[in-house]
Regions:
Chain A
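Short, well-ordered loop/turn sites that connect or cap secondary structure elements
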Residues: 43-44, 49
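Short, charged beta-turn/beta-strand-edge "cap" motif at the junction between a beta-strand
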Residues: 48, 54-58, 194
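N-terminal amphipathic/hydrophobic targeting modules at extreme N-termini
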Residues: 9-12, 22-24
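Feature captures the catalytic cores and cofactor-binding loops of soluble hydro-lyases/lyases
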Residues: 57-186, 223-224
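Short, surface-exposed secondary-structure edge patches
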Residues: 37-42
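Active-site/ligand-binding-proximal alpha/beta "capping" segment
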Residues: 114-115, 191-224
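Short, structured beta-strand/loop micro-motifs enriched in basic residues and often containing a Trp
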Residues: 26-35
Length: 224, 281
């Protein structure tokens, strides 16, 4: 089967300051929580980043409860100003271990809650995997925040970067409880930056092959 | 002649399979990831593939799950018609094995009941069990834990027969494209063609159990698998969705006869953590 690979470097450029969006990972950037605006401003879609410090693990049900507290005007169990939420529901720890496998879950399920959390708490970052809604991307630009992806399915590898794990709220939710995690050099990639850069879109522009080879639509005994 | 298999044996076997399937990534998948690493041109894609291989090695060495989403316990039974199960009810024995395997194996419990506004059942039961009665006096058990992230990106459609092979291809590509980075590519794409509404979904799921690198025995279907794989890998999604040539490691198609009025097609998306282990008792 013959098809053409496009030449490298076809990612679209625009006047956006994120001029190296979608570029291959070069040197890792190191960041430590809590994040100041200047740190977020330095991150561009496609950057590989090592995160250290305290981050918070929360997913579906914990998000629902956090936003319900905001709706009622009550205080959250944790101050999220400048912080990062990691979308993860870890596996249980073996005895003597800090945590079980702890890779990212699909972020899109948190989209209905995220813009509200960012606006109300000063949350600066999220780690997960997969697409975000346009509302979330707008919130990142409006409030200078960033969305990272960790490698989905690399839960055992990621667990090695987690040095401390504590349930700080909602223990009844089991794997969905709100956890505090202390991480060291957790490897993530910037997907959506605070300038509107979007690695997933840029990646498709760079690597998709428009001339999809034509199928030989010969006789198929099983389908005809 | 009947052969007796006890519920205790079955429970023990299922518990072991739950642990093994979750800790040890199959040799076929590891081989496919290594092959993908050699072909991937995107640096970020290569980085993801390297992390996945390293992750599999860590999981096996430390006996921790490859992925924290240790999934719904999907259990396939091929029950010989000459087997008699003693000491209780077969499905209770399977669920006891899941309970034991997930609890003692430090695997995540992800089942919630009732489905709307329910609570975690606490032991990852109930399993989803598919039983096939086959000739003979053996019982083959396959445990295939299935994560939520990739399952959520799966889809089925009832095409008109006139849509033909082109319609099938378009639906598969559209499903993979729409899924994008969400189901943790590189993927294994299971496709069921034919049967009826529920049959095509089961075919798609069973397609995921076939070892990677093993084409469908019918040449026409094997050709469709190759073509679909090539088209999927033109999408550019790449490992992790970070861009690249390797969006899928394999496409497996299974087929069944269909009604004259329908062409059902199901696409079951599987992430690289393609877990399934079998035993024959």
């Amino acid at each position: 089967m013959k098809f053409k690979y496009p030449s490298r470097g076809t990612a679209p450029m625009d006047s956006n300051p994120a001029c190296r969006r979608g570029a291959p990972a070069t040197e890792d950037k190191r960041i430590r929580t809590p994040l100041e605006d200047a740190v977020v401003e330095d991150l561009r879609s496609g950057d590989r980043v090592l995160v250290s410090g305290v981050i918070y693990a929360a997913r579906d049900s914990a998000h629902k409860r956090l936003v319900e507290l905001l709706d009622r005007g009550e205080e959250l169990p944790v101050d999220l100003k400048g912080q990062i939420i990691y979308y993860v529901g870890p596996a249980p720890a073996r005895p003597g271990r800090v945590i079980g496998s702890a890779g990212p879950t699909t972020s899109g399920r948190m989209d209905p809650y995220t813009p509200r959390l960012i606006a109300a708490t000063g949350l600066k970052g999220m780690i997960g995997k997969g697409y975000r809604s346009s509302e979330v991307k707008k919130a990142l630009v409006d409030h200078k925040a960033v969305y990272f992806a960790a490698v989905g399915g690399a839960g055992a590898l990621i667990a090695r970067c987690i040095k401390r794990a504590e349930v700080i709220a909602y223990p009844d939710l089991g794997p969905e409880a709100l956890h505090l995690l202390e991480v060291e050099d957790l490897p993530v990639t910037v997907i959506n930056d605070c300038y509107g850069g979007d690695l997933y879109t840029e990646a498709l522009a760079r690597y998709s092959i428009k001339e999809v080879p034509e199928l030989p639509l010969g006789k198929d005994p099983a389908l005809s | 002649m009947t052969r007796i298999i006890t519920c205790d044996e079955i429970t023990r076997a299922v518990a072991d399979l739950c642990r093994e399937a979750n800790y040890y990534l199959g040799k076929d998948v590891r081989g496919a990831l290594e092959g993908a690493l050699a072909r991937e041109v995107s640096p970020q894609g290569k980085d993801v593939l390297n992390q996945l291989l390293e992750n599999a090695a860590i999981a096996a060495a430390e006996e921790v799950p490859i992925c924290q989403d240790t999934g719904v316990a999907v259990v396939f039974l091929e029950l010989g018609q000459e087997v008699q199960v003693q000491g209780g009810y077969l499905y209770d024995a399977i669920n006891a094995g899941v309970r034991q395997g997930y609890t003692e194996g430090y695997l995540r419990k992800s089942m919630v009941y009732p489905p709307l506004d329910g609570r975690n059942t606490g032991d990852n039961t109930p399993a989803i069990i598919h039983t096939e009665i086959v000739p003979g006096d053996k019982l083959t058990i396959t445990v295939a834990p299935k994560g939520g992230g990739s399952e959520n990106m799966s889809a089925a459609v009832m095409l008109a027969p006139a849509a033909g092979i082109r319609g099938v291809k378009e639906f598969v590509l559209e499903t993979v494209k729409k899924a994008g980075p969400n189901p943790c590519p590189p993927l294994i794409v299971g496709v069921g063609i034919g049967g009826n509404f529920e049959k095509c979904a089961l075919l798609a799921k069973k397609a995921l159990l076939r070892p990677l690198g093993e084409p469908h025995p019918l040449e026409g279907i094997a050709a469709l698998e190759r073509d679909l794989l090539e088209s999927i890998n033109c999408l550019g999604i790449g490992p992790g969705g970070f861009g690249g040539r390797i969006t899928a490691l394999a496409v497996h198609v299974e087929i069944f006869a269909r009604h004259i009025a329908s062409l059902p097609v199901a696409v079951n998306i599987q992430c690289h953590a393609a877990r399934h282990k079998s035993i024959t008792l």
